[in-house]
Swiss-Prot record:
Subcellular localization, as worded in the UniProt entry: Cytoplasm
Active site: E104
Organism lineage: Bacteria, Pseudomonadati, Pseudomonadota, Gammaproteobacteria, Enterobacterales
EC number: 2.7.7.7
Keyword DNA-binding belongs to the record: yes
UniProt-recorded name of the protein: DNA polymerase IV
Assigned protein family: Belongs to the DNA polymerase type-Y family.
Native source organism of the sequence: Citrobacter koseri (strain ATCC BAA-895 / CDC 4225-83 / SGSC4696)
Subunit organization: Monomer.
């Protein structure tokens, strides 16, 4: 049985700012956006969250909820430096590390001899070491598989940890809402609910053949996760090459204004996901995806140096006008391709 730890730093960017400027500790602060009400919030500290300020929220809305919110532009190099230090701490306990972004990672400590092989004690020691050396807090989840470790890391935040032992898994899954499973978004969860599927236990009792017929590959993954199955290894070589968001629509759309409204709703989530990996929002390309009611899929992208909503809307409109051919649209997606790390270093050196 494997021992997987998911470590998630607590409001990481904001925590770095508060550490480096103690005057910010007790006031509501957020990273991202500006007083001109442009952009979205990348992260907010806990005083700001008490007012309802959240990641991916438009800055204008955040300022309405918390007019005295202090907005900070973000310091990518400071976050990157802290992240590298945290990664080095992980490496003291295991070589099997899969970073997901600057502020979270999976660790496989199955074969680790530290702390007598106890994943719970290893997670505790890692969190304490991070605090001692960086004055930053982290939360952790410990479980026999990756997706449960990720869910567990969110159950005792901030500055805590939660353990799901192999013996705990069946009981834990019984009442776990499907929307808590990584990869099951709000739209999918709502669609599943119309089928009477709200928890993992509901899916356990559902016919797998029907799930495969309705959802294809996603149906298989959903069924496996509901059984506690996740055979994915902690991947040391993982290098994220792209980030995307998409929405499958309950009904086909036929008007451009409807498509544009969906893009407006999707964009903040794309910006939030990109900011977790690339706070400076530098990219190689960005593009759009449309799926028509005959199930034909089309994508269009082009080279663009920085994430831009206006450019994505322009690209989407061009795709809509040139490729739709009167068909209804049932899926809208946005994506970016990340810069190759070597090319990025060369570009930065040339600035």
């Amino acid at each position: 049985m494997r021992k997987i730890i998911h470590v998630d730093m607590d409001c990481f960017y904001a925590a770095v700012e508060m550490r480096d400027n103690p005057a910010l500790r007790d006031i509501p602060i957020a990273i991202g956006g500006s007083r001109e009400r442009r952009g979205v919030i990348s992260t907010a500290n806990y005083p700001a969250r008490k007012f309802g300020v959240r990641s991916a929220m438009p800055t204008g809305m955040a300022l309405k909820l918390c007019p005295h919110l202090t907005l900070l532009p973000g310091r990518f190099e400071a976050y990157k430096e802290a992240s590298q230090h945290i990664r080095e701490i992980f490496s003291r306990y295991t070589s099997r590390i899969e970073p997901l972004s600057l502020d979270e990672a999976y660790l496989d400590v199955t074969d680790s001899t530290y702390c007598h092989g106890s994943a719970t004690l290893i997670a505790q020691e890692i969190r304490q070491t991070i605090f001692n050396e960086l004055q930053l807090t982290a939360s952790a989840g410990i479980a026999p598989v990756k997706f449960l470790a990720k869910i567990a890391s969110d159950l005792n935040k901030p500055n805590g940890q939660y353990v799901i032992t192999p013996a705990d898994v069946p009981e834990f899954l019984k009442t776990l809402p499907l929307g808590k499973i990584p990869g099951v978004g709000k739209v999918s969860a709502a669609r599943l609910e119309t089928m009477g599927l709200r928890t993992c236990e509901d899916v356990q009792k559902y016919d797998l053949a029907m799930l495969l017929k309705r959802f294809g590959k996603f149906g298989r993954v959903l069924w496996e996760r509901s059984q506690g199955i996740d055979e994915r290894d902690v991947n040391n070589e993982r290098l994220r090459k792209s980030i995307g968001v998409e929405r499958t629509l309950a009904e086909d759309i036929h008007e451009w204004a409807e498509c544009e409204a969906i893009i407006e709703r999707l964009y903040p989530e794309l910006e939030r996901r990109l900011a977790k990996v690339k706070p400076d929002l530098l990219i190689a390309r960005q593009g759009v995806k449309l799926k028509f009611n005959d199930f034909q899929l089309t994508t269009q992208e082009h080279v663009w140096p920085r994430l831009s909503k206006d450019d994505l809307i322009t690209t989407a409109r061009k795709t809509w006008n040139e490729r739709r051919g009167g068909r209804g649209v049932r899926l809208v997606g946005l994506h970016v391709t990340l810069l190759d790390p070597q090319l990025e270093r060369q570009l930065l050196l040339g600035l």
